[in-house]
Amino acid sequence: MSRFNLTGIGMTSQRTRDRLVQRLQDQGITDPEVLQAMASVPRHIFIDEALAHRAYEDSSLPIGNGQTISQPFTVALMTQTLCNRPRARVLEVGTGSGYQTAVLASHPHVGRIYSVERLAPLVTRAEERLRAMKVHVRLRHADGYLGWPEEGPFDGILVTAAPRQVPPALLEQLAEGGRLVVPVGTDNGQVLKIYDRTADGLEVTSIDQVKFVPLVKGLR
């Protein structure tokens, strides 16, 4: 039996999640499948119990190891941006808490998910929580800058930390017709960008100003 309360009570109840979804709609999230995923995924199990009462605030929260769980609006925006069409094979760079992974897995446009994380303790924690939710993904302790070349190419790639420049390996692993969603920049400013792979090359679109932890090379 899982040690996680997936249903939640009080500040982690379904009613509280539904209020969050209403706020996301007010902020411009329109994909009903994304809104349903945000309503159904129990964000409170992906953060420390001491912060569970803040799980459904629209804010980022610390998850240890110098990392954060992204604010729900950002998770919803990135999911909506990636899932504009079916994506049979999706690579997530930066598993983190596993929350974004779970939201992706809840979207019907997403097929098989491969997720890499450079911090071993986060891989272990995310794996435990995703298993409790019966979410089936392939996790790997690996350097996100390198992607997952053995499993590419991917129809969708979503990066949950900000590189100064997009790693070439990720562009190489993007299939024709595929979409890469990635925040790019430094602590002084980041922009959420879309890279669409077409028969003629890459089309790049800037979406919004964002704030992510930096994408770091190497393993820990």
Predicted regions, residues:
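Conserved nucleotide-cofactor-binding alpha/beta core module
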Residues: 83-203
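Class I SAM-dependent transferase core
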Residues: 1-91, 99-102, 107, 122-133, ...
